[in-house]
Amino acid sequence: MWVQIKSAPNKVIAEMWKDFFEGEGIPIRILPDSEKLEYKERVPYKIYVSQERLHVVEEVLRKL
């Protein structure tokens, strides 16, 4: 199961978070925050992590 950990105002910021977490060895999914599911640059995005890795994300975010 995947849980939302952050929101991003656009795809560029979402990709930056994705790169950051994946650099820490944490698989991430990003999906547009839109019911139309349009994969455009300017729509807000949600950032998801698997439930099993949530504790790792919380620890990484604490260190920021």
Residue ranges and their predicted role:
Residues 1-64:
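Acidic/polar low-complexity segments and flexible, solvent-exposed patches
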